[in-house]
Amino acid sequence: MNNISRYLIILFLTVVAPFGLAAQNNALLERLYDTFANNCIALDCTYSIVSDAVPVKGQCEIEFQGTSYKMKGGGLEIFCDGASVWIMDADVMEAVIEPVSDESQTYMSNPALLFRDMDQMFSVSGSSAAGAAMRYRLSAQKPCGVRTAVLDIDKNAVLQKAEFMMDNDCVIRIDVKSVTVLPKKENSAFAPGKISSAWVVTDLR
């Protein structure tokens, strides 16, 4: 999976994870998590990635439910049904299939593990008003690839924007154009289906 796509998947799974909230002023974040945790969610976003290299900007669509997701952006389509991950490049008709496994995996290479363990990984370090929104600052408690995060959530508990500082000092900013709540789906909806024999497939499972 290329780094841009990997970052984006990790960041969205960070947003929907439980943070062990306690204080009353975290109510909007609790509502956001409750909505995301109990539904299938579709997001349409723009992003920018700032690092020592040339800044990267783009648009992506992501749909997720629990530890299953599918994403389109950065020239790739990525599917995960909770057991396997498919990274597909239609331009060159190539696909790589990877397992979702606890063994020899890091949080950066397996976003599903990051989602599963997020209640242990992050805590809310502060919150404040940001215009009409509430801004939440999150800090990592254990190494997971993301050092800190800032989320802006409006009065209706809808995510507006997010900024993430990665362990490698890369900064990723995301503006959410739309959030759609969908009915829950079977895990098979997050797999690509039969891949044409014209594709070059590398199966690492």
Predicted regions and their residues:
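Flexible, surface-exposed loop/linker segments and immediately adjacent secondary-structure boundaries
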Residues: V100-G131
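N-terminal leader/targeting segments and the immediate start of mature chains
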Residues: F19-P55, T67, G193-R205
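Non-transmembrane domains of secretory- and envelope-associated proteins
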Residues: A130, Q141-T148, K155-R205
